[in-house]
A protein has these predicted regions:
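Polyanion-binding surface elements
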Residues: 1-26
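Residue-level "edge-of-site" marker
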Residues: 23, 36-37, 73
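Alpha-helix C-caps/helix-loop-beta hinges
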Residues: 26-27, 56
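A short, conserved structural fragment
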Residues: 28-35, 95
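Short helix-start
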Residues: 32-58
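A short, Lys/Arg-enriched interface patch at domain edges and termini
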Residues: 48-81
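Low-complexity intrinsically disordered segments
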Residues: 76-181
Length: 181
């Protein structure tokens, strides 16, 4: 499992160092995966915790929610994300239904909601995390995996061996290649 430290976590979440420390240590809304060893050392975070911090930042910044009353929701989400693969979250929307109830729904699915919910599209958050954590991007299902992927052939380049060398002529002529710096 790959971890990022506090400086990288601030970049990925868009939170200041002070806010990140407040949420993960002091108020313990979303605890760090590896707390700091000593004063001044950075905490470490997995992709699940960074995703959860991004969701919390969205709730605070876009919906102006107070986060402290939702500690049980964050704990439930963290446990659920631990059991869910990164790939399984692509094209999903997070539905927060109040209390500690939440669900993942297909982005294209029309949602027959029985109760009120806040919907958060996960796609932009996952795209940001996939680069930093070197996590896989979703592939279009093709039915069968390609053994040798197709590569474009450039017909404008000249061959490295002249035509006489192809015919078995002992006087092979190598054409000049351009040098690259």
């Amino acid at each position: 499992m790959r971890f990022v430290t506090t400086p990288k976590a601030t970049v990925l979440t868009g939170l200041s160092t002070v806010t990140l420390r407040e949420w993960t240590s002091r108020r313990a809304l979303i605890p760090a995966d590896k707390p700091p060893r000593s004063k001044g050392s950075p905490a470490s975070f997995t992709w699940q915790t960074i995703l959860l911090l991004r969701v919390a930042a969205t709730l605070r910044n876009r919906f102006h929610l107070e986060l402290q009353p939702h500690r049980t929701l964050f704990a439930s989400l963290k446990a659920g994300l631990r059991r869910t693969s990164f790939i399984a979250l692509w094209d999903k929307t997070l539905a927060l239904q109040g209390g500690d109830r939440w669900s993942l729904v297909e982005a294209a699915e029309t949602l027959p909601l029985i109760d009120d919910a806040i919907l958060i599209v996960l796609q932009p958050h996952l795209e940001a995390l996939s680069v930093e954590f070197a996590l896989p991007l979703p592939r279009v299902p093709a039915g069968q995996l390609e053994l040798f992927p197709a590569r474009p052939v450039d017909s404008t380049t000249s061959p490295l061996v002249g035509p006489s060398a192809r015919k078995g002529n002992p006087d092979t002529v190598l054409l000049a290649r351009g040098r690259s710096a």
